[in-house]
């Protein structure tokens, strides 16, 4: 899985649920402190630092060339798509969830030569939503580890800065003094935001 944001972290969890043996999260140096530990908590078996490691070589070592049949690309970076295709076995699939806006500067001829597929995914139908809620309700999908910050609206700059420097994954803003949950439960005892049993 390329990309350490919420989409990538959810993809790791779906891979775990589907029974993947090796689930590799690929990120950058700035992901090592916060996002890699969360990836391991939610189901990644390995994390690869693309800032320091040869991603294709390392993922191939971990999984074995013949087992790299599915890569989920959530970053939108062209280099991630290139590396995804390079490591992918013949007849494998890259699911492209991340959005990139720069033109590709590499050949994709080997998707024809080796019968590889790139599948774009963006839309969600009612079936997807129902399945997502079912997985959340059952506890199979973990959301809480991704909520790294809870801040009052007066600290919005701090929240945006944390997102920009990747020290946060998801930031939840609440009303400052008037917030019902904070007034009732206190800042440190905010109730579960995803309680689907009510």
Model-derived segments and spans:
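Rossmann-fold NAD(P)-binding glycine/threonine-rich loop
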Residues: 78, 97-116, 127-134
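N-terminal Rossmann-like NAD(P) cofactor-binding module of classical short-chain dehydrogenase/reductase
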Residues: 69-72, 95
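Mid-domain Rossmann-like dinucleotide-binding core that forms the NAD(H)/NADP(H) cofactor-binding site
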Residues: 1-53, 57
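ADP-ribose/adenylate-binding Rossmann-like module
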Residues: 86-103, 117-121
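Residues in the short beta-alpha loop(s) of Rossmann-like NAD(P)-binding domains
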Residues: 27-32, 100, 124, 177
């Amino acid at each position: 899985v390329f990309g350490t944001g919420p989409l990538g972290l959810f993809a790791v969890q779906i891979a775990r649920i589907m029974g993947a043996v090796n689930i590799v999260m690929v990120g950058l140096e700035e992901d090592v402190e916060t996002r890699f530990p969360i990836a391991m908590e939610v189901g990644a078996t390995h994390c690869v630092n693309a800032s320091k490691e040869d991603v294709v070589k390392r993922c191939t070592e971990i999984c074995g060339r013949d087992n790299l049949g599915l890569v989920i690309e959530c970053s939108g970076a062209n280099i991630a798509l290139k590396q995804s295709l390079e490591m992918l076995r013949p007849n494998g699939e890259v699911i492209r969830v991340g959005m990139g806006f720069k033109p590709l500067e590499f050949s994709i001829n080997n998707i024809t030569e080796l019968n590889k597929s790139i599948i774009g995914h963006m839309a969600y139908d009612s079936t997807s939503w129902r399945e997502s809620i079912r997985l959340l309700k059952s506890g199979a999908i973990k959301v809480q580890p991704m909520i790294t910050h809870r801040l009052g609206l007066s600290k919005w700059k701090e929240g945006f800065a944390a997102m920009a420097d990747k020290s946060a994954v998801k930031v939840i803003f609440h009303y400052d003094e008037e917030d019902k949950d904070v007034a009732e439960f206190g800042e440190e005892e905010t109730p579960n935001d995803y309680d689907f049993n009510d």
